[in-house]
Each structure stands twice: as C-alpha cells, then as structure tokens.
Curated annotation (Swiss-Prot):
Protein name: Ribosomal RNA large subunit methyltransferase E
Catalytic activity of the protein: uridine(2552) in 23S rRNA + S-adenosyl-L-methionine = 2'-O-methyluridine(2552) in 23S rRNA + S-adenosyl-L-homocysteine + H(+)
Pfam family, one: FtsJ
InterPro entries found in the cross-reference section: NA-bd_OB-fold, RNA_methyltr_RlmE, RNA_MeTrfase_FtsJ_dom, rRNA-MeTfrase_E, SAM-dependent_MTases_sf, TRAM_dom
UniProt KW Cell division keyword: no
Domain TRAM: 195-253
PROSITE patterns assigned to the protein according to its UniProt record, in alphabetical order: TRAM (PS50926)
Enzyme class, first EC level, given as a word: transferase
Active site per the UniProt annotation: 148
Binding site for S-adenosyl-L-methionine: 50, 52, 69, 85, 108
An example Gene Ontology molecular-function term: rRNA (uridine-2'-O-)-methyltransferase activity
EC number in record: 2.1.1.166
UniProt organism field: Methanocella arvoryzae (strain DSM 22066 / NBRC 105507 / MRE50)
Length: 256
C-alpha cells in the first residue's frame, strides 16, 4: 500500500477516535458481507486494543459486545471486556454469564511475528484454528464468523474447514489492508449445528410432505427436504445442501 494511502487510514482513525486503523477493515467487511446486524450479540476474540470493538458497537446498534484478550482492554462505553484466555472453559463460562447466545464471533488477532514467513504463516493458521474452535462453542445456530489469516500453503485447507462448519464460506481482502500484506479475512455465515454435511449419504423414512412437494425426513430431529420423496418411502439419500435449520437431498436408492 502506498504510504499516502496507509497514512490516510491511520490519520482517519485518529480523527474519528478509533484505537486502530483496523477499525476500517471491519467496516468494509460488514458493508460487503453483513456479518453484524442491529441487535446482534458480538464476541471479539483477541480484541485488544479495541478497534474492532468500537466498530462492532456501532454496527450492532444496542446489542451486546464482548471483548476477550489476555491483555487488559481500556474501557469502551457499552462494551464488556474479559481479561483471559479465549480457549479457557472459565473464560467461555464468563461470556455465557453475560449473554445467553452469540450471533457473531470476530477475530483480528495475529501471532507475534518472527520474520520467518513460513513460521509466521503456520502460527497464523494455528491461531485462526483456535478461534474457529472457540467460535463453534459460542455461536448460536445460523451465526457468523470472521477471522484474519496470513495466506500460504495451509490457507486453502483452513478455508475448507470453515466451509464444513458454516452453510457459506468465503474470503475477503480489505481495501484498508496494506497492498503488500498477505493478510486476508475468512468469513463463515450460517453456523451449522447439525452433523450433516453436503455429500453425506444416509437412510431415512419420509414422514411428511412440504408445501413445494418435496418429501420431509428427519435426521436427529434435523429437517431434510427430499426431492421426489413421498410419505412412507424408505430411502437412501445424498445431502446436496445444508442450511442452519434444514437440508436438501436427492434420492440415491429407494427400498423395494
């Protein structure tokens, strides 16, 4: 990124009272991907110094915002902060003492850089993996997730892992990031609480009909719409798409 552009975001952050130029990155992410809505409960992992907390509070319009970090975060009006390890069950319990459920988990944390690119990339993916695991413990069904990673040979597999746990996964390079920076944001939308995944083959019995004519089956109380199914059919089906509250499937084999 040219120095002039870099200084633009740095100076703008100072003028607007943001603690970090990274505040603009979350604004750009949300403008395009709508991960935070009015009234949402947001948890920021690795939140110090608090630039993303400030923006999250603006975006969620009165919803709760909680920041977690090993470092102390200077107070922000309307924001709860927890000094603790995000992986600790005690820290996670403290979050649930404040809120019943979490709509969005965000993480702009980065590892301490060594100057060894391969090592820094691996540490970045490891940190993002920890954030993903914590997010799956906090998020409600249909919740959203965004995390920063450094691109490298482990990057694509990480994006795939996010895709397994959310109904939609994508990546975003913020215009507020330095042009030469390898940082990129991985976004997951529609957190999946079911164990079903696209491509799974399962045996079901159609027990109802949907309004559009698809058969309805239940797998561990999760609704699956089966194209061409009729009530009473015993079928082997293949999952074609999974949403937070239901899935779609095609018939592989019908029991005779």
């Amino acid at each position: 990124m040219p120095a002039k552009k870099r200084d633009h975001y740095y100076n703008k952050a100072k003028q607007m009272g943001y603690r970090s130029r990274a505040s603009f990155k979350l604004q750009f992410i949300n403008k395009k991907h709508h991960i935070i809505k009015k009234g949402d409960t947001v948890v920021d992992l690795g939140a110090a110094p608090g630039g993303w907390l400030q923006v999250a509070k603006e975006l969620n319009g009165g919803g709760k915002v909680i920041g977690v970090d090993l470092q102390r975060i200077e107070p922000i009006e309307g924001v709860e902060t927890i000094k603790g390890d995000m992986t600790s069950p005690e820290t996670q319990a403290r979050i649930f003492e404040i809120v019943d459920e979490v709509d969005t988990v965000i993480c702009d944390a980065a590892p301490n850089l060594s100057g060894n690119w391969a090592l820094d990339h691996a540490r970045s993916i490891d940190l993002a993996t920890v954030a993903l695991d914590v997010a799956t413990k906090l998020l409600k069904k249909g919740g959203n997730f965004v995390v920063k990673v450094f691109q490298g040979d482990l990057y694509e597999n990480y994006v795939k892992e996010v895709g397994k746990r959310f109904s939609y996964a994508t990546t975003y390079k913020s215009q507020a990031s330095r042009q030469q920076s390898a940082e990129i944001y991985v976004i997951g939308k529609g957190f999946l609480t079911t164990s079903l995944r696209k491509g799974d083959v399962v045996d079901v019995t159609i027990d109802a009909m949907g309004k559009t004519g698809d058969g309805i089956a239940h797998v561990d109380d999760f609704v699956v719409f089966v194209k061409g199914g009729s009530v009473g059919d015993k079928l082997k089906i293949k999952i074609t798409d999974v949403k937070p509250s239901f899935a779609f499937a095609d018939i592989v084999e019908k029991e005779k």
